Each structure stands twice: as structure tokens, then as C-alpha cells.
């Protein structure tokens, strides 16, 4: 699948890994619809091939409207799920037991939201004419927490583990439609989630990465997205993008 002239949808595309992906896609010649809760000012500065659609990824109608906007630009070929959130709550703590509503919120956004965008995006892609061997590709974002969850990450790890777990069966589901599904599991990246940390703390985190011993650059995530789009044999796979880190319990 060639990225040039393709129509892509990126959730969470106004910041962090999603914004880096959006910029990479635009640089490669794609048209991009950024789906996010806020960030129209950011997207407005990216040029006329970038559009903004405000939507909660768990909202079926809002996501459908965003995909309708993408369809108006041409056949949708690429969907990248970067929207997500997290919390740090122990099952039992001084504050009491983990609130069920807090657990559900994380799973709803990270797992159910990803699936919602995936299924509606797949429906659009399946209606397009094949280009060579395929119609399109869907790329999801998990986390190394799916494999090495730390203390306080029960909800986050469960949500990202769900994204990992559904990758292969959905790739098999969509194979007959000529749609690929791949998941990226990033490690420690320099994103807005870490923006509040002092420089010394971020440097300390980076030193935990075996090689290269630093935080990942969001552009490196975007580079992998482009490679996945253009490599037709990448399908049903979860790729750890983490510098060989394996997270300690805390």
C-alpha cells in the first residue's frame, strides 16, 4: 500500500504519538483526518491536506461522522488508532478499593474505543476497490504494559492487553476483505503523558531502556506506522517498539 495520495484517519492525532503519525503521513503525501476531542487549532496549522473531526472514540455516531468526512476526500485506506488514556490506581490502597467506574473508563476508551473505530473503519475500507493485493490497513496502539504491567496499572494493562489479544483474530476476520491489522506496543516515549515530569526524571526513565538509552521520539513511532502501511506482509502482528525494555514492577 502506497502512502502517497491515500486517505488516512488518525485518532488521538492532535498530540503525542498521534500527532507525530499525522505529520509523517502528511509528509508522505497522504490526506489525513485527525479524530480527537480537541486540537482543531493544531490541525489547522498542518496544511490543507489535514482535516479535524471532533469525536469521542467510544461514540459510534461521532466516529461515523469523522469517517464520512474522510470518505469525502477519497477512499479510506488507512486507520491508525492512537487515542487513549491511563491512570495509576492499585486494587487496594489507603483510599480503599479500586473504583469499578475508574476501571471501566480506561477499558472503555482504550479497548472498546479502539474496537469501535476499527470496526467502523474496516466497514469503509471493505467497500473500496483493491489496490494490488489489498484494500487497506488498520494500525492499533497497545503498550509494553500489555506484557509488563507495573503496580497500579491493572486497568491500563488490561485495556492494552485486550488490544494485543484481538489483533490476530481480527486480522484473520478481515483477511478475506484484503484488510491488514497490525498493533504497535510502544515503550517509554516522550509524549504529553510525561510532559509534567522534570527533565531529571525523564532522563532517569530513559536510562532504563537498554538501547538506545533514552525515551523514544514520537517520530520514531510515526516512522513505523509508515513502514507497516507500505509492507504488505506485516499482518496480524504485535510489534514492540521499546528499545528492548522490560518494565520492573514499579
Curated annotation (Swiss-Prot):
Disulfide bond annotation, renumbered to this chain: none
GO cellular component, as recorded: peptidoglycan-based cell wall; plasma membrane
EC number, as in UniProt: 1.-.-.-
Any one Pfam family match given in the protein's UniProt record, by short name: adh_short
Active-site positions on this chain: 156 (proton acceptor)
Keyword Transcription regulation listed: no
Binding site for NAD(+): 15, 17, 36, 56-57, 82, 156, 160, 189, 191
Sequence positions that bind substrate: 143
Signal sequence bounds: none
Alphabetized InterPro entries for the sequence: NAD(P)-bd_dom_sf, Sc_DH/Rdtase_CS, SDR_fam
CDD domains per record: HSD10-like_SDR_c
Family: Belongs to the short-chain dehydrogenases/reductases (SDR) family.
Protein name: Uncharacterized oxidoreductase Rv1144
Organism annotation: Mycobacterium tuberculosis (strain ATCC 25618 / H37Rv)
Amino acid at each position: 500500500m502506497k502512502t502517497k495520495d491515500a486517505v488516512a484517519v488518525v485518532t488521538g492525532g492532535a498530540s503525542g504519538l498521534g500527532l507525530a503519525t499525522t505529520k509523517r503521513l502528511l509528509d508522505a503525501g497522504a490526506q489525513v483526518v485527525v479524530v480527537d476531542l480537541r486540537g482543531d487549532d493544531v490541525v489547522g496549522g498542518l496544511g490543507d491536506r489535514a482535516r479535524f473531526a471532533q469525536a469521542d472514540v467510544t461514540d459510534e455516531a461521532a466516529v461515523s461522522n469523522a469517517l464520512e468526512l474522510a470518505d469525502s476526500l477519497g477512499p479510506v485506506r488507512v486507520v491508525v488508532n492512537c487515542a487513549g488514556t491511563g491512570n495509576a490506581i492499585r486494587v487496594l490502597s489507603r483510599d480503599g478499593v479500586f473504583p469499578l467506574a475508574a476501571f471501566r473508563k480506561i477499558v472503555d476508551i482504550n479497548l472498546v474505543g479502539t474496537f469501535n473505530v476499527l470496526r467502523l473503519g474496516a466497514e469503509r475500507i471493505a467497500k473500496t476497490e483493491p489496490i494490488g493485493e489489498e484494500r487497506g490497513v488498520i494500525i492499533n496502539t497497545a503498550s509494553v504494559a500489555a506484557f509488563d504491567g507495573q503496580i497500579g496499572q491493572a486497568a491500563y494493562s488490561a485495556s492494552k492487553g485486550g488490544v494485543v489479544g484481538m489483533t490476530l483474530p481480527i486480522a484473520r476476520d478481515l483477511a478475506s476483505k484484503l484488510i491488514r491489522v497490525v498493533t504497535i506496543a510502544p515503550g517509554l516515549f516522550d509524549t504529553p503523558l510525561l510532559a509534567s515530569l522534570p527533565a531529571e526524571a525523564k532522563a532517569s526513565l530513559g536510562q532504563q531502556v537498554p538501547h538506545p538509552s533514552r525515551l523514544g521520539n514520537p517520530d520514531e513511532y510515526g516512522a513505523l506506522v509508515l513502514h507497516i502501511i507500505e509492507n504488505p506482509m506485516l499482518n496480524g502482528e504485535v510489534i514492540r517498539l521499546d528499545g528492548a525494555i522490560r518494565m520492573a514492577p514499579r
